[in-house]
C-alpha cells in the first residue's frame, strides 16, 4: 500500500522532539467508501412480506392478573332486616325528620338532651350508615344522602315541632343541625330556622276563622242592606201617600155651620 512521504517526514520530526514513535504510519488515500442505499422493495414483494409476516403468539395471562370470580351474594342477617324495617317505619310515621351530626356527647349531656326533646315528643334515632344509606338510595328521600357524612343521628316527631327543636338545639351549640325534611319537603338548616319563626297552627287557624267570619258578616250586611233600604223607602212612600189622601179628603168636605148664639 502506498504511503505519503510528507507524513513519514512529519513522524520523524515528532520522534526527535517527543521520543520514540512508530516510523511508519499508514494513511489511506483515494475515494471515500461507497455507502449502499437500501433498495426499494417491489410492491408485490411488499404484499408477500406483509402476508407472511410472523405474528408471535400472545403471552399467556397470569392467573393473578385475571379478575376474581364473582362472589355469591351475601345474605342479610336478621339484624340488618330488623334495622331496615325500623328505618322504614321512622320515615313513614313521622312528619318531621331532622339530621344532626353525632358528636361525642357525654352520657349526662345525651341523657339531658333526650329528656328535653322527649317532653315535646321529639325522639332521637341512631342507625348505622351501612343500613341507612342503601335505604335512602332506593326511596324518595335520596336527596338527603349528602347530609349523611360520618356519624349522624335523627330527630323525629309525628308533628312538626320545629320551634321547640330549634330552641333546644340552640342550648347545645356543639350538636350542629345539618338539615332534614318536613312533610316530604327538604329543608336546610336555615330553612328550619325560618320555619320556626312562623306562627303556630292554632294561631293561623284562629286568624283564618276570624277573617272568614268577618267576610261572612260583611257579605250578609251587603246582601241585606239593599232590601232593607228598599223596604224603608216603600214604607215612607206608603206613609206619604196615606197622609196625602187624608189631606185631600179633609179639604173636600164642607165646614159645619157655626152654632147660633144664645139669645
Curated annotation (Swiss-Prot):
Keyword Cell cycle carried by entry: no
Keywords: Mitochondrion, Ribonucleoprotein, Ribosomal protein, Transit peptide
Compartments, as annotated in UniProt: Mitochondrion
UniProt xrefs under CDD domains: Ribosomal_L10
GO molecular function, one term: structural constituent of ribosome
InterPro entries registered for this protein in UniProt: Ribosomal_uL10-like_sf (IPR043141), Ribosomal_uL10_bac_type (IPR047865)
Single biological process term from Gene Ontology: translation
Ranges where the record places region Disordered: 241-263
Record's GO cellular component terms: mitochondrial large ribosomal subunit; mitochondrion; nucleoplasm; ribonucleoprotein complex
Transit peptide interval: 1-29
UniProt key word Lipoprotein: no
Record family assignment: Belongs to the universal ribosomal protein uL10 family.
UniProt subunit comment: Component of the mitochondrial ribosome large subunit (39S) which comprises a 16S rRNA and about 50 distinct proteins.
Protein name: Large ribosomal subunit protein uL10m
Biological source species: Rattus norvegicus
Amino acid at each position: 500500500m502506498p504511503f505519503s512521504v510528507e507524513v513519514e517526514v512529519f513522524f520523524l520530526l515528532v520522534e526527535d522532539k517527543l521520543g520514540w514513535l512508530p516510523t511508519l504510519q499508514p494513511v489511506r488515500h483515494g475515494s471515500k467508501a461507497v455507502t449502499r442505499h437500501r433498495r426499494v422493495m417491489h410492491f408485490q414483494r411488499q404484499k408477500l412480506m406483509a402476508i407472511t409476516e410472523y405474528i408471535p403468539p400472545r403471552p399467556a395471562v397470569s392467573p393473578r392478573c385475571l379478575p376474581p370470580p364473582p362472589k355469591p351474594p351475601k345474605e342479610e342477617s336478621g339484624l340488618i332486616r330488623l334495622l331496615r324495617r325500623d328505618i322504614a317505619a321512622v320515615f313513614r310515621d313521622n312528619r318531621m325528620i331532622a339530621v344532626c351530626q353525632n358528636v361525642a356527647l357525654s352520657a349526662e349531656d345525651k341523657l339531658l338532651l333526650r329528656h328535653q326533646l322527649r317532653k315535646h315528643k321529639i325522639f332521637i334515632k341512631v342507625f348505622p350508615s351501612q343500613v341507612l344509606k342503601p335505604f335512602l338510595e332506593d326511596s324518595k328521600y335520596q336527596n338527603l344522602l349528602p347530609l349523611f357524612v360520618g356519624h349522624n343521628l335523627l330527630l323525629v316527631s309525628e308533628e312538626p315541632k320545629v320551634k321547640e327543636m330549634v330552641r333546644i338545639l340552640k342550648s347545645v351549640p356543639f350538636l350542629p343541625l345539618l338539615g332534614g325534611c318536613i312533610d316530604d319537603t327538604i329543608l336546610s338548616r336555615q330553612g328550619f330556622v325560618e320555619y320556626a319563626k312562623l306562627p303556630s297552627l292554632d294561631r293561623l287557624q284562629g286568624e283564618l276563622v276570624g277573617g272568614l267570619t268577618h267576610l261572612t258578616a260583611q257579605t250578609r250586611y251587603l246582601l241585606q242592606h239593599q232590601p232593607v233600604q228598599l223596604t224603608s223607602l216603600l214604607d215612607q212612600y206608603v206613609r206619604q201617600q196615606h197622609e196625602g189622601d187624608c189631606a185631600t179628603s179633609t179639604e173636600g168636605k164642607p165646614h159645619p155651620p157655626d152654632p147660633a148664639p144664645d139669645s
